[in-house]
Amino acid sequence: MAALGQKTVLVIEDDPWTRTITTALLAGEGFAVVEAKNGEEGLKQARAQAPDAILLDLALPTKSGLDVLRELKGETSTQDIPVIVVSAYGTLMNESDAHCAVGVIQKPFDYDDLVGQVEHATARSLEVALT
């Protein structure tokens, strides 16, 4: 549960080590972090938690990150949540998918880039909520 005024980030990442490190980094910067280890769990958490931003790994088992992104952007309850996609394989998105994400981070990611993009995405979430 996020404290009043605290931004919530949903981290959808199948690799336990990467998920743990990412969660620790974001929590250390003052974000409330919700974790999901696969696409289905991530979709459930996004619907239930309505996070301020989502950090989404593209290479997920069973349901790909691109499928998750498309579902998130296709549902009224989640379409305005800013999504930052993460990939170890460079750009795996085509142009039609790229416009759905507010940022792209390549693994291994730079700490400052990760935090900066999440801060930007959560600020964007607030702007959308106020309009």
Short names for language-model regions:
Residues 38-41, 64-70:
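Acidic catalytic/metal-coordinating carboxylates
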Residues 57:
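Active-site residues of response regulator receiver
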